[in-house]
Amino acid sequence: TREEAMRLSCDTLARLMETVGDTPIRLGIETMGKRNQLGTLEEVIEQCKVDPHFHPVVDFGHLNARGVGGQFPDRDSYRRVFHTIADKLGAEYATHLHCHFSKIEFTDAGEKRHVTFEDAVYGPEFEPLMEAIIVDNLCPRIICESDGTMAEDALAMKRYWRERRGESAK
């Protein structure tokens, strides 16, 4: 069952940290895009509670694909993710969240493949994410995972963010 898989994963993570001991290294646990895998936001948060060295890695495209689209229609839908993490793990986890972002094609089972920002069929859109980051004064690390256009799409995000903040869009 899913509950048994969660118990086993948390036990494994605890044993890992017993073996590793105290370390300055943070270990990321990522949200997943396929519905039959562990990796909902709630599951990742529970896994991160095993040890303070574990930090959530939120892939917004994965969460959108898991929910078969439409998960992030506006700024507030992104803000809820950051607020949930802050409430359950602490503000520092949310403020400096490590994120992945791309649009993702999906089926009823979840993630199928990463696509580019040019894709008009699949989401999510990045603009509301940038607005959420600005309004809540967050400082996340965002890795763009677009298929074949990572640099171009990452630059589009950066430009949008800077323009919204009133900075030069270099």
Regions found by a protein language model. Give the residues of each.
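C-terminal helical cap(s) of enzyme catalytic domains, especially alpha/beta-barrels
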Residues: 151-167
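Short helix-capping segments at alpha-helix termini
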Residues: 18-24, 49-53, 89-93, 135-137, ...
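Active-site acidic/histidine proton-transfer and metal-coordination neighborhood
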Residues: 1-58
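Active-site-proximal loop/turn and secondary-structure-junction residues that shape catalytic pockets
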Residues: 31-35, 60-64, 103-105, 148-150
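Conserved, mostly hydrophobic/aromatic
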Residues: 27, 59-60, 99, 142
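Gly/Pro-rich active-site loop or hairpin
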Residues: 38-41, 64-139
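A short, acidic, flexible beta-alpha connecting loop/helix-capping segment that sits on the rim
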Residues: 142-152
